[in-house]
Each structure stands twice: as structure tokens, then as C-alpha cells.
Amino acid sequence: MNGTEGPAFYVPMSNATGVVRSPYEYPQYYLVAPWAYGLLAAYMFFLIITGFPVNFLTLYVTIEHKKLRTPLNYILLNLAIADLFMVFGGFTTTMYTSLHGYFVFGRLGCNLEGFFATLGGEMGLWSLVVLAIERWMVVCKPVSNFRFGENHAIMGVAFTWVMACSCAVPPLVGWSRYIPEGMQCSCGVDYYTRTPGVNNESFVIYMFIVHFFIPLIVIFFCYGRLVCTVKEAAAQQQESETTQRAEREVTRMVIIMVIAFLICWLPYAGVAWYIFTHQGSEFGPVFMTLPAFFAKTSAVYNPCIYICMNKQFRHCMITTLCCGKNPFEEEEGASTTASKTEASSVSSSSVSPA
């Protein structure tokens, strides 16, 4: 067996030499060199100093600028809140524990860190799903005479919380569990063991079907239909350069959004599934740590893609940061005017990442 299982932990290293110790009580420097833990702490610090400002700024400018408080932007605020959950509930804890080389907060701290990190990650994931559905409903109009309003937006936000809790809460009440993962400095769902009484197998299968494959299918379907609708509208107005430019912009945005989702979740899901289906096989602590980096980094690049690329949000952010004046206002205004001159069903603003 490649790993050593103990009470509420699994260390991916054989204990033949007798060096394996509980990750709740002893530094894990026998897994990787101490400098690697320092590097992990530095990376977490980078995510904190970049993830907190951009997500907090999103909330702040929305409060400050009334024109941003529209139903279609509710889900973006929810995404920012989800990222802040990851920053405060996951990144800060992992940075501190990495500096010590083990999970110093014990079993209770592992449950709390695992819960908040999972809750934030799942809220972010389902926010992207709801965002895709909302854009599909608004642009493709699968339901005739449908008008997206505040009640729909609130239901979408509530749905993300329900789905996130349906993933983050069960390990706290006996369906699977949270244990230190990778380099043993952060906690996540137990993919490693088949410990009797915690039903890891059924929970992992549930996770992959409900919280990975279904979101993946929904996002591909919604954005696929959206691109087809935009291309059809652009084909009807081939003589309009503005329409063609809008079509290219929408296609580019959709590709970026889908790739970002895959970069965030595919490595983590793939490695977790491999570990689950190959229990006892050879894999090191870095094998699980690196994919988790991709998922954690989403707290930084998701706001950049879904919020900062939106012209209205970007303008308000720059205005706020520059004390009420946007030095790029003429350029932004010219771009907005050009887009408004086109009386077309192709609207990059309604399908843009924000």
C-alpha cells in the first residue's frame, strides 16, 4: 500500500520506515522538502493579496454605483462572495499551516477549513452554471415572452447556495469526511480511503455526477446554443462590420469562459477520480496538491474574466479607483457608442462574462 491511514487522515507515503506522523501533530517534511511548504505559503499569500482586492472591489463598486445593481449582475456578486469565502476560509488557513509544515488547527479546524473552502468553490462553480443558463435564457429566448427579472436572479443565487451546501455539508454529518490532502496543509473531501462507516464511495460518485459532469454538460450546452444563436444573427447581417465584430467578441468570450472552467475543475476532478479508482497505487503528495492550485486560482482569474472584461463593471471600477474620474472614458465611450449603433440581436454586452 502506498499510503498510511490513521484516525481522520491519510498520508500518501508508506510507513515501512516508521517516519509517518499525524498531520495534525507533526511537520510533514518527510513528504517534501521544507522549502516546498514555504513555496506553498508564498503562493497562498499571492492568492490572498490578488484575490481579496478584486473580489472586494466588485462588491464595493456595486454598492457605490446603482446602475450595476441589475438582476443580471446578482450572480456576479454571488461569484465574488464565493471567491471571498475561498480567500478567508481556505487561503489564509493554508498559508498559516504551510508555514508550520502541517495542519496545526487539528481535526475541528480541518472540518471548518474543508467546509468553507468547499462551500466557496462549489458556490463559484454553480454561479458559473447559473450565469450560463441566464445568458442562454436572455439571448436565445427558449421561452417566448420570457423577461428576466429580480425574482429569477434571486432564485438563481439561492440555487447556488443550496447546491454548494449539498456538497459541503454531508462530510460534516457522516457522508464522507474532510481530511488533510496533498502536502497535508489543507483539507478536502476524502477521495483516498474506503473507511467503513463514512460511505466515501457513494459520496465521491455523487460528487462527480452532480457537481462535475452535470455542470459541465449544462455549461457546454448553454454556451454552445448561445454561440449558434449569435452566429445565425450575424449571418443575417453580413454587411455590418459591427455585427461581425460583436459575433467574434462573443465567440471569443465563450471560448475563454469554457476553457477557464475546464482549467479550474478538470485537473482536480481527474486526479481525484484517479486516486479514488486506484487506491493503493503509487502517487505522491504533490500529485494532489498541484491540481488543487488550479481550482484555488479561480478566485483570482474568475473575477478578471467574468467581471473585469465587462465594460460597465470595468468603467465603474476605474472610476472608483481614480477618485471619480475614468482617464480612459473617451475610449470606453467610443466603444460603447459603436456597439449601440447596431440594431442587431447580437449583443456582446448581454452575453459578455459579466
Swiss-Prot record:
Q: Name one GO cellular component term.
A: photoreceptor outer segment
List the Extracellular topological domains: 1-36, 97-110, 174-202, 275-286
Q: How is it modified after translation?
A: Phosphorylated on some or all of the serine and threonine residues present in the C-terminal region. Contains one covalently linked retinal chromophore.
Name a GO molecular-function annotation. photoreceptor activity
N6-(retinylidene)lysine, modified sites: K296
GO terms for biological process, alphabetical = absorption of visible light; cellular response to light stimulus; detection of light stimulus; G protein-coupled opsin signaling pathway; G protein-coupled receptor signaling pathway; phototransduction; visual perception
Q: Where is this motif: 'Ionic lock' involved in activated form stabilization?
A: 134-136
Q: Does Transmembrane helix appear among the keywords? A: yes
Residues carrying covalently attached carbohydrate according to the record: N2, N15, N200
Membrane topology, Cytoplasmic segments: 62-73, 134-152, 225-252, 309-354
Classify the protein's membrane topology as the record does.
Multi-pass membrane protein
Q: Which UniProt keyword terms apply here?
A: Cell projection, Chromophore, Disulfide bond, G-protein coupled receptor, Glycoprotein, Membrane, Phosphoprotein, Photoreceptor protein, Receptor, Retinal protein, Sensory transduction, Transducer, Transmembrane, Transmembrane helix, Vision
Its function, per the record, reads: Photoreceptor required for image-forming vision at low light intensity. While most salt water fish species use retinal as chromophore, most freshwater fish use 3-dehydroretinal, or a mixture of retinal and 3-dehydroretinal. Light-induced isomerization of 11-cis to all-trans retinal triggers a conformational change that activates signaling via G-proteins. Subsequent receptor phosphorylation mediates displacement of the bound G-protein alpha subunit by arrestin and terminates signaling.
Q: Which family does it belong to?
A: Belongs to the G-protein coupled receptor 1 family. Opsin subfamily.
Q: What is this protein called?
A: Rhodopsin
